Amino acid sequence: MTKNNQSISYKDAGVDIDAGNALVEAIKPIAKATARPEVSTSLGGFGALFELPMDKYKNPLLVSGTDGVGTKLRLAIESGKHDQVGIDLVAMCVNDLIVQGAEPLFFLDYYATGKLDIYTARDVVAGIGEGCQQSGCALIGGETAEMPGMYPDGDYDLAGFCVGIVEKADLIDGTKVKAGDVLLGLASSGPHSNGYSLIRKIIEVNGANLNEECDGQPLIDALMAPTRIYVKSILALMKQIEIHAISHITGGGLLENLPRVMPNNTKAKVDTKSWNRPAVFDWIQTHGNVEFHEMHRTLNCGIGMVVVVDEKDQQAAIDALTAQGEVVSVIGKIESSESETPEVDLV
């Protein structure tokens, strides 16, 4: 029994069920706009149903992935820019699937906060919906967790989960990579969703003005540009040529992500002057006095995805990707190496 016979509600404890229900209603149209024919449920149920398109596949493989946005969220929270980090969340997941040739099918999100702000959450989910539309996958469910005492006021965290499908014979796993193959770099929109702990430290040390101009726009806009989603461009390319490997350039940069899709005894020789690096990376390197090696093992430095193709398919691949709106640069080649483990040589 409480003192003075006071009745304590869940809302008194910091959890507003009505706010949660209102959010579900607010995001139903967002989810509906992403629907695919295979989806047979709507938001609000205990589980989401998705009928696999078995008539399109002989031997399908399901490919799954999960990711977050990292400390880019801190910049979003501090700047009040919540409408694009949802795109980042989807991008980080679906870009990981497409490197294996998998078409994203459906996506789920997890939104955790200390006190639910319906408007902030709705903006975030609207971005998730936009990311799902860009990648052609359905937003079929999620979880909103209001956990008083776990997060400071105004803070939230995100996680995303995605499942895709690929014909087993079409799986892209890097085993076909060989000396002489060409590295095609697809331009990024900025830092994407990696390296923000470094970026935030540089902002702090410099006392940077986030409204200062960077390549014709406020610095904060350059830093918060949503991660580019490459799914539809890669799916279109797969129909035209054989892709030997794809690497999503995330945390670890070119130095650590290219070897993940290369066989032993190979080296990727990359010309770092072969593409136009966005000005935001110049700002980061200059204001942080960041060394060359550190830049390329922390940030994508202007290349968000690398596609490895046979030399004979180079121009066809460039034409196909350009037709999809990608900015493509020939950034290097695969060479033979005496090292048993894959190497990257940046010049």
From Swiss-Prot:
GO terms for biological process: 'de novo' IMP biosynthetic process; adenine biosynthetic process. GO terms for cellular component: cytosol. The keyword Nucleotide-binding applies. It is found in: Cytoplasm. It catalyses: 2-formamido-N(1)-(5-O-phospho-beta-D-ribosyl)acetamidine + ATP = 5-amino-1-(5-phospho-beta-D-ribosyl)imidazole + ADP + phosphate + H(+). GO terms for molecular function: ATP binding; phosphoribosylamine-glycine ligase activity; phosphoribosylformylglycinamidine cyclo-ligase activity. Pathway: Purine metabolism; IMP biosynthesis via de novo pathway; 5-amino-1-(5-phospho-D-ribosyl)imidazole from N(2)-formyl-N(1)-(5-phospho-D-ribosyl)glycinamide: step 2/2. It holds the Pfam family AIRS_C. Its EC number is 6.3.3.1. Gene3D superfamilies: PurM-like C-terminal domain (3.90.650.10), PurM-like, N-terminal domain (3.30.1330.10). InterPro entries: PurM-like_C_dom, PurM-like_C_sf, PurM-like_N, PurM-like_N_sf, PurM_cligase. Keywords: ATP-binding, Cytoplasm, Ligase, Nucleotide-binding, Purine biosynthesis. PANTHER family: TRIFUNCTIONAL PURINE BIOSYNTHETIC PROTEIN ADENOSINE-3, TRIFUNCTIONAL PURINE BIOSYNTHETIC PROTEIN ADENOSINE-3-RELATED. HAMAP family: AIRS. Belongs to the AIR synthase family. This is Phosphoribosylformylglycinamidine cyclo-ligase. The gene is purM.
